[in-house]
Structures are given as C-alpha cells and as structure tokens.
C-alpha cells in the first residue's frame, strides 16, 4: 500500500511540473505519519507486517494522535483491524500514549525559571565585551540540520522523553502513596475501661510522702478497733437474743402458763372422765379436795304469820350450778372449756339423790321433808339430743 501511494505521487509530479514542491511536502508528511504509526503499533506489541498495514490505513483515514481516546471496537473494524487481540492491544496503548502527550503539554506549559547567570548577561549586554562574545557565538553556531533528520530525531527524542517523564511520574506517585500510607495514624481500638463497666479501681497511696504515711496510719488504727456490729457502733454492751429456742411451745406457755399447770389440767380432765363414767348421776359433782366451793346452800327463812295462822317457814330452792376448776395464778385468764358430760347425762337417766345433797325444810308445827330433784342440764348444740327418759317413782316421796 505504501509503495502504491508513492508511485501515484510520482506520476502526479510528472504530470504537473509546477506542483513538485507541494508534492514533496505532502510526501514528507505522509512518510512521517506512517513511520510514527508504525512505531506506535510496534510499541503496542503488533508484528511488523500487520503494523505497516495498520499504519497505512490510519494515514489514509487521517487518524491523528489526538483521536486515540475516541477509538473503539467498531471504528477499528471499519479501519480493517479485525483481530481481537490487536484491537485490545491498540486501545490499551492508545490510553498510554494519550497520558504521555498530556504530560508533555503540562511540562511545556510550565515556564522555566531564568538562571542568575543569564540575568547578569542580559544586564551587562550593553558593554562592548558582551557584544563581541555574543557576535562570536552567533557566527560559531553550527548550520541547521535538514528537515527530515531533525523531524525524525525530534520524534524519537520526544518519545523517549515522554517515556522517561511517565516513568518518573509513576515513581513519584508511588512514593507519594507510600508516604501517605506511612503518615496515616493507625486508628486505636476503643478500649472499654473498668469505669464504663461499673467497676472502680482505687489506687491506694504507697506511703512515699508524709501525708500518705499519715493516711495509712489512720487506716491501720481504724482497722484495729474491730467494732463491726451495729450494737457496738450504737454503744450497746450486749446483743439482744433474737433466736428462739428449739423447744416447742404451746399457746398456754406463750400466754404465761407453766408445764406443771398443763399437767395438772390434764390430770383433772382424766379424773373427770373416769369418775363420770363410773358414778351415777347425782346432781352437781363437787370436788372437795380441789379448793373451796363457791356456792353454799342458803339458810332457811322463817316467816311469821298472824296470831290465828300458824307460822310457816319456806325453804328457798338452792341454786344449782356446775363449779369450774379452781383458778390458778397466771398472767391472763384462760378461756373456759366446755364441760364434759358423761354417758348417763347424755342418755338422760335419772340418778338417786343422796341424803347429804337433799334440802331439808323445817317448820314449828310439823316437820316435813321435801325432795327436790334437779333438772338435767340442757344438751349442747353440737351433741345428739337425749333419748326419751323413763319415769321413776321416788320411794321417799
């Protein structure tokens, strides 16, 4: 393809002799462009044969270096690049070249600072010696090199300089990144202290200063007192015994009764039950050995009548009541228990009344004896009602 372009250009030059200069300029620019693109593709890693073909296609389609970022897969297929590996390599290398061009533009835009020697030469340019030196330097300067050689050398130098600048920039960026990582302060993990958890750590003085020694002596003196109980702190000499004994106590013992009194009460109840089961019903039973009786039969009353009538004496009916047990000394009176009734009383069987318990009635006229039979006690509400009792005739009456 390159040879064909050159042949066509030579034919055009022969036909039009006046345009030889323009043709030469275009031919130089084309060869420069193709050489640049060939170098570009070689740097991308493409073999020499396909690299020449791709360079001619880029030159024919007027692709410039500023259009590298606009290349994509579709455009590469239209340009005749169909190999997928070549497409990927060209696109990657296009990004690298674009970065290098940007770096060149940045370095060219930065103005170079003039050196102090150049400033001094400019200041002293008005002197004759400086003028002579400047003229000699201008005359001794080498002639200008041809255009082709200068262009090729500048292109090669620019590529090498751009590569060096890119490498330097990459190294500088890596160093800056490392410095940033080294300067980053490591974040400390949050430590939960004992105060946050609710525990307090008290650091006691070690006794290095006189003040701390005094504090430690006071603490040791306070520890030697051994007043630990509440009674000691309040000033009490002995503690009150709040513990109860292991011996079981009853209600009467807590009220003030003694075990001896309880035994006597139990003995009396046993005697009552045994006597009531053996003896017959004889009115009110009285225990003479257990204390004085409270009720006594009242004396007979004498009634004086008129002269015509005889004086009659009326005997008062004795009051019948059951005597309770003799009272014993104690802090409080015990509640009276219900009287125990014998079987004969519950059955309602009449008992023979002894002569000692009969009431006698005397009069001045004729002595008469009356027998008073007391009524049986009323049955308790909790007991069974008595059976029908049998009537007996009193032999004495």
From Swiss-Prot:
The keyword NADP does not apply. Residues 356-367 have a biased composition (Polar residues). It comes from the Eukaryota. There is a cross-link at residue 239 (Glycyl lysine isopeptide (Lys-Gly) (interchain with G-Cter in SUMO2)). GO terms for cellular component: nucleus. The keyword Phosphoprotein applies. Residues 300-316 have a biased composition (Low complexity). Keywords: Isopeptide bond, Phosphoprotein, Ubl conjugation. The modification Phosphoserine is found at residues 115, 141, 269, 296, 342. Pfam families: DUF5577, SAM_4. Residues 135-156, 289-316, 354-397 are annotated as: Disordered. InterPro entries: C19orf47-like, C19orf47_SAM, DUF5577, SAM/pointed_sf. Residues 385-397 have a biased composition (Basic residues). This is Uncharacterized protein C19orf47 homolog. It comes from Rattus norvegicus.
């Amino acid at each position: 393809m390159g040879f064909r372009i050159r042949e066509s250009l030579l034919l055009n030059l022969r036909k039009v002799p006046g345009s030889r200069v323009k043709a030469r300029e275009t031919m130089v620019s084309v060869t420069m462009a193709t050489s640049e693109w060939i170098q570009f593709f070689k740097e991308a890693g493409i073999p020499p044969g396909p690299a020449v073909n791709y360079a001619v296609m880029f030159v024919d389609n007027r692709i410039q270096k500023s259009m590298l970022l606009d290349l994509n897969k579709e455009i590469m297929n239209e340009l005749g690049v169909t190999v997928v590996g070549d497409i990927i390599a060209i696109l990657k290398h296009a990004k690298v070249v674009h970065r290098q061009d940007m770096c060149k533009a940045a370095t060219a835009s930065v103005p170079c600072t003039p050196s102090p020697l150049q400033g001094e030469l400019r200041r002293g340019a008005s002197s004759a010696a400086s003028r002579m030196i400047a003229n000699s330097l201008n005359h001794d300067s080498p002639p200008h090199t041809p255009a082709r050689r200068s262009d090729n050398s500048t292109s090669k130098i620019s590529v090498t300089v751009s590569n060096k600048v890119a490498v330097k920039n990459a190294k500088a960026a890596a160093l800056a990144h490392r410095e940033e990582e080294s300067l980053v302060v490591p974040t400390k993990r949050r430590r939960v202290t004992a105060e946050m958890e609710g525990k307090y750590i008290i650091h006691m003085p070690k006794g290095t200063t006189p003040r701390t020694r005094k504090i430690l002596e006071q603490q040791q003196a306070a520890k030697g007192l051994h007043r630990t109980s509440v009674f000691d702190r309040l000033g009490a000499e002995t503690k009150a015994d709040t513990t109860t004994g292991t011996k079981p106590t009853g209600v009467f013992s807590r009220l003030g009764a003694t075990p001896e009194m309880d035994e006597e009460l139990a003995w009396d109840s046993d005697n009552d039950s045994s006597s009531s089961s053996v003896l017959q019903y004889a009115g009110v039973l009285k225990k003479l050995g257990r204390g004085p009786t409270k009720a006594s039969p009242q004396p007979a009353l004498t009634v004086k009548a008129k002269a015509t009538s005889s004086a009659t004496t009326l005997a008062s009916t004795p009051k019948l009541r059951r005597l309770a047990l003799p009272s014993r000394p104690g802090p409080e009176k015990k509640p009276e228990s219900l009287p125990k009734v014998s079987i004969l009383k519950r059955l309602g069987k009449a008992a023979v009344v002894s002569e000692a318990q009969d009431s006698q009635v005397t009069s001045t006229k004729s002595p008469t004896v009356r027998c008073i039979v007391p009524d049986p006690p009323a049955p308790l509400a909790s007991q069974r009602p008595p059976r029908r009792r049998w009537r007996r005739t009193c032999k004495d009456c």
